Each structure stands twice: as structure tokens, then as C-alpha cells.
A protein has these predicted regions:
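Nucleotide-activated sugar donor-binding and catalytic core shared by glycosyltransferases
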Residues: 1-49, 53-55, 59-177
Length: 177
């Protein structure tokens, strides 16, 4: 199945930023959440590109509870997996606090800025596909500026993408006739 989410949102490849934020340490902390939203607002203003933010229900609830404005961001409902994967694969940069998204962007060759102070995916830092920016608005903006020069030439630490084919070959070769 092919997704046309870019067409539906009127987006061009590499001409938007994608954001996810759902971790309690970010969304339940008013200071951190405000810092993240301020950083994203600064990114949108400086680059004049859409900042697509599919808002996790937890994050949406906190934004409303805390009375924090949208700051010019394109807040959307969460997307299905195929739509989100399409958005990830064509983004200029993904800003996230999700461990899984850090892995996905690394495999897809898309730069990632992690809005946390540490990560359980250090291999993404080691290969250069990801940087840690925390929840500081200035660091978020500086990270986006720095990724303008990134080239997706890092080595994928998660394998070569042909594990399924290898498994089928082994199963077929060992199957009784």
C-alpha cells in the first residue's frame, strides 16, 4: 500500500520538519514542554517551513491543561504507521523524544534531533544520524541549523535490510523435500 500523505498535507519532500513528543519527562514538565514548543516555533519562523506535529493524546492533553498555545505549529491528529513512515522518510529533519523514531530515521537516512538529555539508542549518536538537544529552545534551533550540512552517509547500525530474505533462503534450503 502506498501513502499519499505528502499530497494530502500539501508537502514537498525535504521541505518540512516532523515532530513527535510524548515522553512524560517532556510533556508533564511545563518548563520542558514550553521549551520544546518555543524551539519548534523558532525553527518554523527561521526556516519558513511547515513543522508537522502529530500530537500524541497525552501531549495534546498537557498542551491544553497548561494553556500553552500552538505557537504557529501544524498540530495534527496522529497518523497511521504507513503515513507516518512516509512523513519520516521525506522530512528534512525529525525532532523526537521517541526511541523507535530515532532508529527509524537512522535506517531511512533522515537526520534526527532527540529532545531528551540521554537516549537508549546510543548507536544513532555514534554513527552520526542523531544528536541530543534536550528541551532547550536555543539548542533545538541550533540543531536544526547544524543539520543543514548533514549528509545521510552514516552506516546503518541495525543491519543491511535483507534479514527476511536470508531467513527465507535458510528455511527453503533446510526444508525437507
Amino acid at each position: 500500500k502506498k501513502s499519499d500523505i505528502l499530497g494530502e498535507l500539501d508537502l514537498e519532500p525535504r521541505e518540512y520538519f516532523l515532530v513527535t513528543a510524548h515522553r512524560p519527562e517532556n510533556v508533564d514538565n511545563r518548563t520542558r514542554l514550553k521549551g520544546i514548543l518555543k524551539g519548534l516555533e523558532r525553527v518554523q519562523k527561521e526556516f519558513s517551513l511547515p513543522v508537522i506535529f502529530p500530537v500524541h493524546p497525552r501531549t495534546e492533553k498537557r498542551i491544553k491543561e497548561l494553556g500553552i498555545g500552538e505557537n504557529g505549529l501544524n498540530l495534527t491528529k496522529p497518523f497511521g504507521f504507513l503515513e507516518f513512515l512516509q512523513l519520516e522518510s521525506q522530512a528534512r529533519l525529525v525532532l523526537t523524544d521517541s526511541g523507535g523514531v530515532q532508529e527509524e530515521t537512522c535506517v531511512l537516512g533522515v537526520p534526527c534531533a532527540t529532545m531528551r538529555y540521554d537516549t537508549e539508542r546510543p548507536e544513532t549518536l555514534d554513527v552520526g544520524s542523531n544528536i541530543l538537544v534536550g528541551a532547550d529552545s536555543q539548542k533545538i534551533l541550533e540543531a536544526v541549523r547544524s543539520t543543514e550540512s548533514w549528509k545521510p552517509d552514516w552506516k546503518n547500525p541495525y543491519g543491511d535490510g535483507i534479514a527476511g530474505k536470508m531467513i527465507i533462503m535458510v528455511c527453503a534450503a533446510t526444508r525437507p523435500q
